[in-house]
Design a protein with these regions (language model features):
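Short, well-ordered beta-strand segments
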Residues: 11-15, 63, 110, 156, ...
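Flexible hinge/capping segments at coil-to-helix
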Residues: 5-6, 76-114
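A late-sequence structural motif
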Residues: 24, 173-216
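Alpha-helical "hinge/linker" immediately C-terminal to small N-terminal DNA-binding modules
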Residues: 1-9
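Beta-alpha-beta core module
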Residues: 73-80, 85, 144-194
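Secondary-structure junction motif
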Residues: 107-129, 195-197, 203, 213-214
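Central regulatory/effector-binding core of bacterial HTH transcription factors
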Residues: 9-71
Length: 216
């Protein structure tokens, strides 16, 4: 096992699932960086499957992903749930006429890609609610989804946490929350990385405040 304490400049390669909120991932990674330690953080973005393959090949030190792994099926890999948050539907004015969630049938929707865990959960939720929605597009980037939604008068999806300040303006309105559909955040790492200081800090940090949304 590597003694990372002896390294003068710690390299920390992190893969980030492209479907996750970059704002929340950035806050998670804050724990990896401390002033009195020389750390070189490198972040890479891709799909969960591609990142998991790179982690297995020792090309990454950790993955921040939207789904866990089964340690019994992935020998030598561990996953830890960092947190989860509900998602909201947003749009620009004027607001839909019907109440939520029936209003989701009034406009075309922008959702996370169906290859992401959240995208699949939302599609199942639409079916469970008996909603006949029209999907205009699938986006993994929240900022791009917001910009495209404003241009095309569409309803789009983002973490409810964004109500705190990210979407706290008059042009974007939260029309409804789905608390039982959660966007999950998991840290996945190899056994050889357990002693890495950055891995230890991320795994030992309490992120409960980060994943607590503001009240409506």
């Amino acid at each position: 096992m590597v003694n990372y304490r002896k390294e003068s400049n710690l390299l920390f390669d992190v893969g980030v699932a492209d479907a996750l909120s970059k704002r929340l991932v950035s806050s998670v990674l804050d724990a990896a960086v401390v002033e009195d330690e020389q750390i070189h953080l490198r972040c890479f973005e891709s799909t969960h499957e591609m990142l998991l393959e790179q982690l297995s090949q020792h090309k990454l030190d950790m993955i921040i992903s939207d789904c866990p792994i089964d340690s019994t099926q992935q020998e030598g890999l561990f996953s830890m749930k960092i947190g989860e948050c509900g998602v909201s539907f947003w749009c620009t004015n004027p607001l839909p006429e019907k109440p939520f969630p029936a209003c989701l049938e009034e406009r075309r929707l922008l959702i996370p890609g169906r290859r992401s865990m959240l995208g699949r959960k939302l599609l199942n939720w639409f079916n469970s609610q008996g909603l006949n929605v029209e999907i205009l597009g699938e986006f993994d980037d929240a900022a791009l989804m917001k910009a495209f939604g404003a241009t095309h008068n569409a309803i789009f999806v983002a973490p409810s946490l964004y109500a705190n300040d990210f979407y706290n303006d008059d042009s974007v309105v939260e029309i409804g929350r789905v608390e039982n559909v959660m966007e999950e955040y998991h840290a996945i790492f190899a056994e050889r990385m357990i002693q890495h200081p950055a891995v230890q800090r991320i795994c030992n940090t309490d992120y409960s405040a980060l994943f607590t949304p503001a009240s409506k």
